[in-house]
Each structure stands twice: as structure tokens, then as C-alpha cells.
């Protein structure tokens, strides 16, 4: 009788599945080209904008190692960001904390993705959108793909561009609002960030429609010395 293979056997050591060009190829076969991938970064933080990117990759110059930005190190993201910006058509848009508060985080995210796709210097004929929802008012056909940043290389590239751009914006915001440590946590609800909010109250970058701010609307805002350049 043969013995069952152990899960530690090399036969069970499968390579991780990386995003590929399948969705883009299907769209091209259906007569839609070029194809853009779109994704956002920063839906969950308590502070800062949500940033969206749209990317049209050159099929002959797709950077190696593209993946969901959350699965990459900061160093890997920075290196891929540089390569994407050098070889692809890229557009970036953002929705501020005030925009998020005036609408909601989903609407603000979808609006940023729409503006990013609209802003491409080469018009996309099809857009692959990360998530369950397609932004309204797009200038092209589109398809929403759940976990698209781990399935489509174009969406993966957009996720990297959005993440690196937002992290850089929050690092610059740290100079204007040094008490909050934005360069360390990018506005996410870390212990340090929550402690700073408890000590100093919210600032103008905080999303007042998010908890815990709904119960602290009366606290004074920190004063910005000027606008924060998103680039």
C-alpha cells in the first residue's frame, strides 16, 4: 500500500499564483483596446485622502513581479512604481478627507477611480476595476473584478501606484502635522495614531465622518500652514 504524501512534500509546494494578462487579452479579443486597470489606496485610514490610479501597461514591457501592493514590501513597491511610471500610461486622482465626509468612502473612492481613468493621456476602451463596483460615468466599457489586484497585472500595477503615491502624500503631511506621526502609519488606526488624536484632537486631514470622530466634532482642529502637494 502506498503511503500518502506529506503536505511538506515538494509535490505539495505550489508556486503562488500571480496576477496575469488574461483579462486584458480577453478584452482585446472582444475588440476593446487599450485596457486600463484601476485601483485605490486608503479606504480604511482615519486620516488623509483616498488615492486612485489607472494604468495602461505596454504588453511588451510589463514589469516583472507585479502583485497586489499589500503583498509587497515598501522597497518592492517603490522599485515597481519607478518601472511602471517609466513604461506605462498612468493617471492618478484623489478624494480628500472633506470629499469623503461630504459623500462617503465608497462614493469618494469610485469618483477618484473615474477621474483617474478620465485623466489617462491615452483613452482606455476598457477598464478593469478592483472590487465589486464600477464607477458611474466612465468614458469606456468596464468590468469589476473582486480581488482584481491579485488577478490582473494592470490592476496590480494601479494598486502599487496608488499605494506609493498615497504613502508619499502622508509622509509629506507629517511635516505639516508632526504630532500625529502620519509618516509612520499613513493615517491608519494604530495605537500611536489613536493616542495622538486623544492628546491633540483631530486635524483637518482626519475623516470626521469616521468613528471615533463623530463623537468628537466639538474638538478644535489643528491649523495647516498650507496645502499639501499630492505629487
Curated annotation (Swiss-Prot):
Its EC number is 3.1.26.4. Transmembrane segments: none annotated. Its main location: cytoplasm. It catalyses: Endonucleolytic cleavage to 5'-phosphomonoester. GO terms for biological process: DNA replication, removal of RNA primer; mismatch repair. GO terms for cellular component: cytoplasm; ribonuclease H2 complex. Endonuclease that specifically degrades the RNA of RNA-DNA hybrids. Belongs to the RNase HII family. This is Ribonuclease HII. It comes from Sinorhizobium fredii (strain NBRC 101917 / NGR234). The lineage of its organism: Bacteria, Pseudomonadati, Pseudomonadota, Alphaproteobacteria, Hyphomicrobiales.
